[in-house]
Amino acid sequence: WGGGIMKAEAAAATAKLLQISLKMKKTTMKDIMEFRNSIEIKMTELAAKRATDEQIEIISGHLEKMKNEEYKLDTFAEFDYNFHKSIADASGNSVFSLMMETMRPMLYNHIIYTLNPTFNPEHSNHYHEKILQTIRDRNPEEAVEAMRLHLAGTERIIEELEGVNVTI
């Protein structure tokens, strides 16, 4: 493949095609959680090993936006998605970044669904702070555990809402 522009255009086109395909299927909350559990834990481990100081500051910046937001659900969800996407970028694995970008609309809706009934930014931020700290400390084992706990908490919310089979 050619230069950076061609690669970026190809990645964007691939992401768009996958987004369209996913919209045509009945994707459930359970599907999204299985996806998240399979890639976000590994990408967080890799981010703890590979993230540059600049990438860590980007992750931190998204968390600060979540903490300083006036607690509007839609903007908080966007910052939440950006937090997770920046971890994918910091993993150094371009496939993780592409998959997170591809899943953006579904992940955004997933975040909205899980936050909407009990919107408690402090609870969510607690998990995010721990994840960021483990990446900053360059501790992959603790990063894995922090993300695992975060996703387990999200999964519990979905089960409490009886939303496992809800399609997005």
State each model region's role.
Residues 1-35, 45, 164-168:
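Short linear motifs at protein or domain termini
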Residues 141, 156-168:
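Generic C-terminal helix-cap and adjacent flexible tail
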Residues 116, 120:
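Solvent-exposed loop and edge beta-strand segments that line ligand/cofactor-binding
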Residues 32-113, 123-134, 142-156:
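Conserved amphipathic alpha-helical segments that form helical-bundle/coiled-coil interaction surfaces
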Residues 26, 73, 159-160:
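Glycine-centered secondary-structure boundary/capping sites
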